[in-house]
């Protein structure tokens, strides 16, 4: 369920500001989105896994806060990120 190093490098290469960027909000949101989608698939199979469901809700909340920050700082970056990730907002 955890992201492998190769998966992280691939995601950071696409969404980070540079190759080793791990701190920018775009990179963090992209990593959280991948983890959220993986957990969502897990919960489709294991409906009664309430510990993982709580973890999913925490990740969604963290992503929401980061997206709110990006929207406040730069709306163009926010819209670009939402479009590239395929989020509904």
From Swiss-Prot:
A Pfam family reported for this protein in Swiss-Prot or TrEMBL: Ribosomal_S15
Keywords from the named record: Ribonucleoprotein, Ribosomal protein, RNA-binding, rRNA-binding
Keyword rRNA-binding attributed: yes
GO molecular function list: rRNA binding; structural constituent of ribosome
GO cellular component: cytosolic small ribosomal subunit
Record carries keyword rRNA-binding: yes
Gene Ontology BP term (one): translation
Record-linked SUPFAM superfamilies: S15/NS1 RNA-binding domain
Role noted for this protein: One of the primary rRNA binding proteins, it binds directly to 16S rRNA where it helps nucleate assembly of the platform of the 30S subunit by binding and bridging several RNA helices of the 16S rRNA.
Stored HAMAP family: Ribosomal_uS15_B
Assembly: Part of the 30S ribosomal subunit. Forms a bridge to the 50S subunit in the 70S ribosome, contacting the 23S rRNA.
Family: Belongs to the universal ribosomal protein uS15 family.
Protein name: Small ribosomal subunit protein uS15
């Amino acid at each position: 369920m955890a992201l492998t190093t190769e998966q992280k490098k691939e995601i950071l290469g696409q969404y980070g500001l540079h190759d080793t960027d791990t701190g920018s909000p775009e990179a963090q949101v992209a990593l959280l989105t991948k983890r959220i989608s993986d957990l969502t698939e897990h919960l489709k199979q294991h409906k009664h896994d309430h510990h993982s469901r709580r973890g999913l809700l925490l990740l969604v909340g963290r992503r929401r806060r980061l997206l709110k920050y990006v929207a406040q700082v730069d709306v163009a970056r926010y819209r670009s990120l939402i479009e590239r990730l395929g989020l509904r907002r």
